[in-house]
Amino acid sequence: MEQLHFINPETALILVLLSSLLFAVIGILYSRKYRGYSNYLTAGRKTGTLSLTSSLVASALGAWILFGPASAATWGGIGSVIGYSLGTAFPMIALIYLGKKIRKTFPSGITFTQFIFHKIGKNLFKSILLLSVFYMFIFLCAEVTAVAILINYISSVPLWTPAALVIATTLIYTLYGGLRASILTDNFQFLIIIILLLVCMYNIFSSDFISYQDITNNSGNLLSGKYIPNYTAGLTFFIAVAATNLFHQGNWQRVFAAKNYEVLKKSLKLSFLIIIPIVFFMGITGIIAISVDSKVNPDLAFFSILLKDKSELLYMVIIILAISLTVSTVDTLVNAISSLIVVDGKKINENLKSSNGLVILLSIIALFVASKGFSILYLFLLADLLCCAAVFPVFYGFYKRNLKERDLIISVITGLLLGFLLFPSPDFSKSILVGILLPFDLFPQIVTSSLLFWSFLLATLGPVIVIISYDSFKRR
């Protein structure tokens, strides 16, 4: 990725350090008044509507929104924008119903894996525990890498420096204060994120180089109902993003942290309504960017139009926005991983120490990945596939009493096998079935050009068909 070097490295580092330290100080000072495992893991189960809403939104919106939606829109069109928006927000609606079920069954619960263990069985519990930790670790790497690349892009600061500052300051207050600290800092980060996004929105839409006519003339296909990727990309992002977020323990922690179910329900509805327009706006900037410059780097689509005038103030806004987005997500991930490890053990005190050690180790690995600028997109897609295969069996199992653990595991394996047959190779040119087992020419273009879509679709629908067929067979 090219570098702008518009802000000198010292200024960029000062902004990163001050922003990160601000959240660390707030988190530590607040947490000193609220000690104990209940506050650390569930924030005392006393979180109100405004606080819970802002925490849910801030946790859902990481630095990925600065890159992902706009990049996808440059080739996936308006469909990918809608899919990304709904996929990010949909878990909030799903948690209204799933949250009610799990809070009623386990009023003193902490993790969703507890429910799986008691309701379904030990083997599926272990698999989902590993899946959840794997997904959140990949998410952690992606967030730290994204902010490191962004700061490097606009100021030439070495990748490891902002990554180390963000990880270190976040770990300090998160491992000390737990969920209480995370939710409080989320409240501040939410306000900063909303204000700075409004600043970005105003600057983009008040620019004289953007017009609807230019967009329709230069990128009309991205808005067309006849453009197939509008549908395949939209469904791909919806399925993948929605499925993975249901396995995000950070969301489930907030389900248990709500003061009562009415607070939870209202907060989730508000979060849904706030998330959709934010992600939609970020996606639309990709369509605008590609219409202004057909050769734009997709990963930089949002920045290419926001920073077109090279305003130093806007560069500073971007740095503060990126840090707020990253820290809000990283502290959620750290808390979530820690809670899974703690609750899985019998002795909470000993497990809290071991969980902190493991979280620090994972953070060091994430720092290494970020310092090298490695792309972990393929691992992210792999985690998406695993979640797609597991999402229906696991959450359907929340409600069905007569389903055996063995049958649910078989359905997950079926989904994985079907998904892996069409899961694209690292260069996205072929899959196990298309191009390896069978010749490429045997398949229509709609399959060969959208392998990821068909992979996710089969991984999701395969278990549904298996379970429904099994239910029908048992009724005979």
Please report, for each region that a protein language model flagged, where it lies by residue.
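Membrane-embedded helix-loop-helix hairpins and adjacent transmembrane boundary segments
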Residues: 1-476
